[in-house]
């Protein structure tokens, strides 16, 4: 931070309050590089009460436990079970690894919250933000790759299955694509990683009022949010359109044959593929929007809008949303995979999982049933 920044922090507007000990401000007690790393915006706010830090720490402990256990089981089962090592499931495995990384950095946040501030310093901040960049951007692009895989498999059932080599190239592409956006701020070539909110978490700088910062925010928003979101919407819209058209053709043919349905397994206990795929597509889009839209909007407001809207408490909400989705994903999707549940049932009978052998689900796992787990495991 330059001299102007330090003068701002120690300015007359806070000196009376600080000398009287009336209000503890964010950043109090920090010096040198740690103080210089904090955007001026946060230094104008009072420190949050200890109860806020405690509540967030407890919430993150719960998220961390659920995410590490859930994603850890997905990684273990999918990587050690031969029948689950299909090309499509490599993408599910990569997504679980990224979600695991997302929450593996949570102890830094929990420690900062326990110490009520920027306790880990700049080094811990850089590690936290680097892991967040790789896991966040990588998860978005992996979701886009999964959407492409599902679209290819469902719309071209005869020749749409992706080869193992192609999927591995897609996984490599995800990590290569994420690397510049993760390393450029770390090396301070373009952008930088800074504390945010209660100074217990770190992200890329979206508050410094410079052209370089604004350009970086615009580019990373486009490449890490708009691009994968557009792909996800395009591919899942294509899936829904294809399935609805197929269902309409079946109904028309059944009408011509004067039968109620051409489906052999029609019954109240079995949802049609139309409904299953529509639900999967809607849920995938919703989770991606719910997890990253708040953060994207916050970054845009910080760079181009009214920064006064971004109070420390408000900016903690997007961070919680991202962690919640990393926690929920394995439980909502991969654990619904019939073959995955059967493997859990075999290895961990004490979980009391009741998953009967379902030959229909197994046989159709390449077309409809695999869509939900591959969406955002």
Swiss-Prot record:
Q: What is this protein called?
A: Opsin-2
Q: Where is this region: Disordered?
A: 355-377
Give the matching PROSITE patterns.
Answer: G_PROTEIN_RECEP_F1_1, G_PROTEIN_RECEP_F1_2
Q: Which cysteines are joined by disulfide bonds?
A: 125-202
Q: What does this protein do?
A: Visual pigments are the light-absorbing molecules that mediate vision. They consist of an apoprotein, opsin, covalently linked to cis-retinal. May play a role in photoperiodic photoreception.
| Residues with glycosylation annotation | 3
Keyword Glycoprotein set for record: yes
Q: Which organism is it from?
A: Manduca sexta
Homology family:
Belongs to the G-protein coupled receptor 1 family. Opsin subfamily.
- Topology versus the membrane, per the UniProt entry? Multi-pass membrane protein
Question: Could you name the Gene Ontology cellular component terms for this entry?
Answer: membrane
A single GO BP: phototransduction
Q: Which positions make up the signal peptide?
A: none
Lineage, top ranks? Eukaryota, Metazoa, Ecdysozoa, Arthropoda, Hexapoda
UniProt note on tissues of expression: In the retina, expression is essentially uniformly distributed, but a higher level is seen in the dorsal region of the retina and in the dorsal rim retinulae.
């Amino acid at each position: 931070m330059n001299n102007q920044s330090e003068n701002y922090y120690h300015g007359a507007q806070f000196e009376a309050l600080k000398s009287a000990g009336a209000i503890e401000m964010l950043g109090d007690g920090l010096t040198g590089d740690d103080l210089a790393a904090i955007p001026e915006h946060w230094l104008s706010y009072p420190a949050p009460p200890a109860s806020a830090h405690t509540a967030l720490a407890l919430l993150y402990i719960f998220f961390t436990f659920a995410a590490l256990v859930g994603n850890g089981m997905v990684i273990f089962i999918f990587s050690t079970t031969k029948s689950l090592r299909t090309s499509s499931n490599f993408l599910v495995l990569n997504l679980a690894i990224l979600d695991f990384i997302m929450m593996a950095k949570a102890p830094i946040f929990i420690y900062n919250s326990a110490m009520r501030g920027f306790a880990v310093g700049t080094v811990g901040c850089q590690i936290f933000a680097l892991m967040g960049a790789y896991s966040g951007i990588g998860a978005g692009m992996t979701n886009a790759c999964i959407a492409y895989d599902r679209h290819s498999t469902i719309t071209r059932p005869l020749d749409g299955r992706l080869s193992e080599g192609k999927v591995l190239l897609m996984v490599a592409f995800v990590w290569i694509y994420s690397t510049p956006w993760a390393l450029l701020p770390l090396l301070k070539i373009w952008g930088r990683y800074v504390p945010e909110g209660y100074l217990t978490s770190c992200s890329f700088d979206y508050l410094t009022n410079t052209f370089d910062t604004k350009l970086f925010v615009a580019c990373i928003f486009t490449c890490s949010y708009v691009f994968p979101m557009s792909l996800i919407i395009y591919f899942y819209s294509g899936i829904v359109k294809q399935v609805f058209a197929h269902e309409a053709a079946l109904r028309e043919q059944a009408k011509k044959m004067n039968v109620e349905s051409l489906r052999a397994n029609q019954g109240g206990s079995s949802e049609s593929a139309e409904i299953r795929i529509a639900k999967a597509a809607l849920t995938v889009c919703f989770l991606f929007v719910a997890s990253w839209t708040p953060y994207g909007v916050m970054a845009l407001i910080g760079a181009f809008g009214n920064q006064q809207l971004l109070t420390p408490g408000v900016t903690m909400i997007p961070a919680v949303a991202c962690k919640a989705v990393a926690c929920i994903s394995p439980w909502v999707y991969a654990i619904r995979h019939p073959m995955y549940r059967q493997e859990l049932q075999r290895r961990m009978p004490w979980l009391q999982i009741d998953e009967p052998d379902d030959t229909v689900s197994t046989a159709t796992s390449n077309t409809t049933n695999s869509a939900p787990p591959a969406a955002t495991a």
